[in-house]
């Protein structure tokens, strides 16, 4: 999830950079 976006119920939440946060809940871009 590096340089990905946290997927929120309303769409896309703020950018996520931490790999421990960017996983299945992030769309990789």
From Swiss-Prot:
User: What GO CC annotations are associated with the protein?
Assistant: extracellular region
**Tissue note:** Expressed by the venom gland.
Where does this one sit in the cell?
Answer: Secreted
Write the record's keywords in alphabetical order, separated by commas. Disulfide bond, Ion channel impairing toxin, Neurotoxin, Secreted, Toxin, Voltage-gated sodium channel impairing toxin
Q: Which InterPro entries match?
A: LCN-type_CS_alpha_beta_dom, Scorpion_toxin-like_sf
Q: Which domain of life is it from?
A: Eukaryota
One Gene Ontology molecular-function label: toxin activity
Note whether Nucleus occurs among the keywords. no
Reported function: Excitatory insect beta-toxins induce a spastic paralysis. They bind voltage-independently at site-4 of sodium channels (Nav) and shift the voltage of activation toward more negative potentials thereby affecting sodium channel activation and promoting spontaneous and repetitive firing. The fraction to which this protein belongs exhibits low toxicity and induces transient paralysis in all insects tested (the crickets A.domesticus).
Protein family (similarity comment):
Belongs to the long (4 C-C) scorpion toxin superfamily. Sodium channel inhibitor family. Beta subfamily.
Domain comment quoted from the record: Has the structural arrangement of an alpha-helix connected to antiparallel beta-sheets by disulfide bonds (CS-alpha/beta).
Q: What is this protein called?
A: Toxin Bl-4
Q: Which organism is it from?
A: Buthacus leptochelys (Egyptian fat-tailed scorpion)
């Amino acid at each position: 999830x590096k340089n990905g976006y946290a997927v929120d119920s309303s769409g896309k939440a703020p950018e996520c950079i931490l790999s421990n946060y960017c996983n299945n809940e992030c769309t990789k871009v």
